[in-house]
Amino acid sequence: MARLFGTDGVRGVANRDLTAELALALGSAAARRLSTAGHARRRVAVVGRDPRASGEMLEAAVIAGLTSEGVDALRVGVLPTPAVAYLTSAYDADFGVMISASHNPMPDNGIKIFGPGGHKLDDATEDRIAELVQQGPGERPVGAGIGRVVDAPDALDRYLRHVGKAVTTRLDALTVVVDCAHGAASAAAPLAYRAAGANVLTINADPNGLNINDGCGSTHMETLQAAVVSYGADLGLAHDGDADRCLAVDANGRVIDGDAIMVVLALAMRESGELASDTLVATVMSNLGLHLAMRDAGIEVRTTSVGDRYVLEELRAGSYSLGGEQSGHIVMPSMGTTGDGILTGLRLMSRMAQTRKSLAALAEPMHTLPQVLINVQVADKTTVAQAPSVQSAVAEAEAALGDTGRILLRPSGTEQVVRVMVEAADEDTARQLAVRVAESVSEQR
């Protein structure tokens, strides 16, 4: 039986895969697993969401599940995912729930749960919650024991004060175009950047519940690239639907991805003495160019599986201070327990202001090798890599690349696909090898 929880919570098409009934059951199960009876105070869970239309329905269902188990729901409304994680700690809540499908299209939605302190749950805890969903509720409280719903009007201000601490140098000399993806960053990001002194121009910051991630945000950079050049801005920043990602665009309209952002921040943090053990944590999807840049700088790279939860686990295990993903999830444990796109944007602009260098100049140490990624639909993503014909195709590709590139096969954590990624000295070679391996994978259908 497939796990209920994927790499980033429970996701699916809202009202088909992720129904109100399932959301209620998840709220109830999380309340039973994560809240502890016998508190001197009432048990509390923070609940937030992104602005997609189905969020209102799922929020109501989750809150019904929580309150039915005697847990008060502290409703913070539309806020970034990292804000919900932070507020779970700041309000000393038992746990937090974020309703969002991040960068996914509008019809999708998801539920991710943060434990005490705003930390993501481990697999064992998620599996126990899934078991409780299957079991259904037990005896429920009545009367005064039923949970209450409380709104938190200061939630956004508390989060903005928190991320504002990341600003080491005022940003008054910088003009930034911000693509908010019609998502949870639409209110928070412009306020945070303006509070730090930046001249902020916004695009895609008018959420109506239906337009989230629609041709905009960190998965559609073209509009932002054009806007930065058109306005003559110093840089652009793109967030996704729940603002846990940040990608950038330099003044020339060139995309600065998560790998390049990590290089900039790692070098800055080592200079300031903040880079613990002179180590950066990245995933297997990070470009070989990142590894080469860090090698040249004398910085070690610790590699994890794909997913910011695995980056977080490695950061905590090694007490490291910076990690992230090529997609723009950047984690700084001293400031947060999960990827925070707005925090990343502030740190990046602070570095520009401090050094008085352009983003292009700061990102110069990162030389990205051409990378080709092909998603192949398969019947069983867990067994494809063991097929002899696939192993043979991979071995041939590795022999052709030698030490000038690399190949990676991995099953998606959220879809029934296998991702074939090849990096090489030139794009033609990368594409040819990726296509050959992808064809061998597709034959396993």
Swiss-Prot record:
Entries under NCBIfam families matching the protein: glmM
GO cellular component assignments: cytosol
Reaction it catalyzes: alpha-D-glucosamine 1-phosphate = D-glucosamine 6-phosphate
HAMAP family on file: GlmM_B (MF_01554_B)
Cofactor: Mg(2+)
Family assignment from sequence similarity: Belongs to the phosphohexose mutase family.
GO MF term list: magnesium ion binding; phosphoglucosamine mutase activity; phosphomannomutase activity
Organism: Mycobacterium sp. (strain KMS)
UniProt-annotated catalytic positions: S102
Protein name per its UniProtKB record: Phosphoglucosamine mutase
Gene3D superfamilies membership: Alpha-D-Glucose-1,6-Bisphosphate, subunit A, domain 3 (3.40.120.10), Alpha-D-phosphohexomutase, C-terminal domain (3.30.310.50)
Modified positions (Phosphoserine) in chain numbering: S102
EC annotation from Swiss-Prot or TrEMBL: 5.4.2.10
Pfam family, one: PGM_PMM_II
Keywords: Isomerase, Magnesium, Metal-binding, Phosphoprotein
Any GO BP: UDP-N-acetylglucosamine biosynthetic process
Job description of the protein: Catalyzes the conversion of glucosamine-6-phosphate to glucosamine-1-phosphate.
Cofactor note: Binds 1 Mg(2+) ion per subunit.
PTM annotation: Activated by phosphorylation.
Residues that hold Mg(2+) according to the record: S102, D240, D242, D244
UniProt key word Nucleus: no
Origin superkingdom: Bacteria
